[in-house]
Amino acid sequence: MKKTVICILSLLLTANISAQVIDYTKPDSLKVMSLFKKAKTLKDKSMSSYMVFFGRQFKGVPYVAKTLEKNANEKLIVNLHQLDCTTYVETVLALSKAMAQHKPTFASYCENLKHIRYRNGKVAYPARQHYFTYWIQENTKEGIVKNIQSPTPPFSATQTVKANYMTTHLESYPMLKGKQQWIKQIADMEKSITGTRQKYIPTKAVTNSNVVRKTVHNGDIIAIVTTKAGLEISHI
């Protein structure tokens, strides 16, 4: 049986808005503005309220993997009509941050998305935070999220990360073909998180108990970790 982990990320706010070139369609930009218009009617203006609200707006959106792999040269892709688990979380978080910053504009959404998805906001394939443990660490440094691994219980087990899936499965990543420098940078990313020890809630402890209800809150991001070789987190 696979081992699972729940990592709770409470959300903090930062502001750093600048203009940029992005890859998007008109329906995507219109949807962003439509969602902002709806969110303005909320009485609860907290970050957690925005996270729950925007999260619910994407019910029924098709699950499509690898929507970020469409360009030979990396671009900031905005796609609200096809989502996987990671792009879903990034989309909801970027929308929520823009509202919490009182900047409900398409430009603000894109700026937030850029800093959530890429290390230091630099749009480049090797800077994309491919491993979610790395995503957590970098977004924690940026003050965008807070990584919570307590109290004990329910965080009663420990996982030691060993990441090498991308560099040992290059055939699954066409963008890396023939790009030795990029491969080295991905290997550096893997090395930086390998050995990380993180507390998690074991499957048997995921129950409708008082301690779990007091630990997991509305708007939290939950990461599920697997024992699959080379990977650390399988779903969010």
Please name every model-derived segment.
Residues 63-199, 217, 222-224, 236:
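Acidic/His-rich structured neighborhood in mature extracellular/periplasmic domains
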Residues 211-215, 231:
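Short, surface-exposed secondary-structure edge patches
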Residues 229-236:
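C-terminal structured interaction module
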Residues 200-212:
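Short alpha-helix capping/helix-loop boundary micro-motifs
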Residues 1-24:
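Bacterial Sec-dependent N-terminal signal peptides
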Residues 47-59, 63, 68:
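Sequence/structural signature of beta-propeller domains
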Residues 42:
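Function-determining sites in protein domains
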